Swiss-Prot record:
Designated name of the protein: tRNA U34 carboxymethyltransferase
Subunit annotation: Homotetramer.
Statement: the UniProt record of this protein carries the keyword tRNA processing: yes
Family: Belongs to the class I-like SAM-binding methyltransferase superfamily. CmoB family.
Binding site for carboxy-S-adenosyl-L-methionine: 91, 105, 110, 130, 152-154, 181-182, 196, 200, 315
Name of one Pfam family that matches: Methyltransf_9
Any single GO BP term: tRNA wobble uridine modification
Cited SUPFAM superfamilies: S-adenosyl-L-methionine-dependent methyltransferases (SSF53335)
Organism of origin: Escherichia coli (strain SE11)
Functional summary from the UniProt entry: Catalyzes carboxymethyl transfer from carboxy-S-adenosyl-L-methionine (Cx-SAM) to 5-hydroxyuridine (ho5U) to form 5-carboxymethoxyuridine (cmo5U) at position 34 in tRNAs.
Taxonomy of the source species: Bacteria, Pseudomonadati, Pseudomonadota, Gammaproteobacteria, Enterobacterales
Enzyme class, spelled out: transferase
Length: 323
């Protein structure tokens, strides 16, 4: 059973303590009524992983853990088998004692695009909304963050995160809470809030921006990464049934329109710091994610378009401040 007691004890002593007014009851309800049918199988994989304290831990340049002496072939095989029980692995990569988890996404590439534009993360308390397996949280810790809290309701991601955490020596500087942002009170407690790859899944994108703002301290920084299309400040794509085979894509604005949305929600110092086309080198099928990926979602005769005829995925990073 995944235990949240360490997180409760941690935030009881800091400026997130008011979250304890609602969080334990929400988690208890989740444990009692909302667990996925495969959750026990996934959590067993975490439980059966060996307890290892890394001799060398690199979170600054990658997520890599190594032992002082090489593990035996049997130990490596055990780790690999248990981690494969948690497939598909979408966000990474991870290198853990000789087991290299080549995830669908090269999330390290996204981090390399984002990092140069951030305020110094040293000592910061960070919220990562829609954090997936938690890859970027570990990179935030590597960049000096004091605490990284991720929220994501996908329970497989929780188990992937806990598996990686265990292999990183049960590191308590990052925590994943299996809730969506709409389940959080207005904590107003995080120095930096990340929302990467979430906005286009929201039926009400402006409401999402308000929710992000409600989590920030005054003068806190928002890092927003999402799908965009080319166009002026009035350009927004509203896809039909699917976009790149995804059913739950609602609004894809231009970067300039998104800048206006942020302004409308009261953010200031808004910057578009990166815009790039998603390539099939950055998102692709691997032996750790064997189902369809980006190449299957693009027009085989014109990769500048999705199979539905929309512009192929392009992503922008915007940074803004809550006054």
């Amino acid at each position: 059973m995944i235990d949240f007691g360490n997180f409760y004890s941690l935030i009881a002593k800091n400026h997130l303590s008011h979250w304890l007014e609602t969080l334990p009851a929400q988690i208890a309800n989740w444990q009692r009524e909302q667990q996925h049918g495969l959750f026990k199988q996934w959590s067993n994989a975490v439980e059966f992983l060996p307890e290892i304290k890394p001799y060398r831990l690199d979170l600054l340049h990658s997520v890599t853990a190594e032992s002082e002496e090489p593990l035996s072939t049997g130990q490596i095989k055990r780790i690999e088998t248990l981690m494969r029980n948690l497939m598909p692995w979408r966000k990474g990569p991870f290198s853990l004692y000789g087991v290299n988890i080549d995830t669908e996404w090269r999330s390290d590439w996204k981090w390399d695009r984002v990092l140069p534009h951030l305020s110094d993360l040293t000592g910061r308390t960070i919220l990562d909304v829609g954090c997936g397996s938690g890859y970027h949280m570990w990179r935030m810790i590597g960049a000096g963050a004091h605490l990284a809290v991720g929220i994501d309701p996908t329970q497989l991601f929780l188990c992937q995160f806990e598996a990686v955490r265990k292999l990183l020596g049960n590191d308590q500087r990052a925590h994943l809470i299996p809730l969506g942002i709409e389940q959080l009170p207005a904590l107003k407690a995080f120095d930096t809030v990340f929302s990467m790859g979430v906005l286009y899944h929201r039926r009400s994108p402006l409401e999402h921006l308000w929710q992000l703002k409600d989590q920030l301290v005054n003068e806190g920084e928002l890092v927003l990464e999402t799908l965009v299309i080319d166009g002026d400040e009035n350009t927004v794509l509203v896809p039909g049934d699917r976009y790149a085979q995804m059913r739950n894509v609602y609004f894809i604005p231009s970067a300039l329109a998104l800048k206006n949305w942020l302004k409308k929600c009261g953010f200031v110092d808004i910057r578009i710091v990166d815009v790039c086309v998603t390539t099939t080198e950055e998102q692709r099928r691997t032996e750790w994610m064997v189902t369809e990926s980006l190449s299957d979602f693009l027009d085989p005769h014109d990769p500048s378009k999705t199979v539905e005829g929309y512009p192929a995925p392009k992503r922008a990073v915007l940074i803004a401040r809550k006054p």
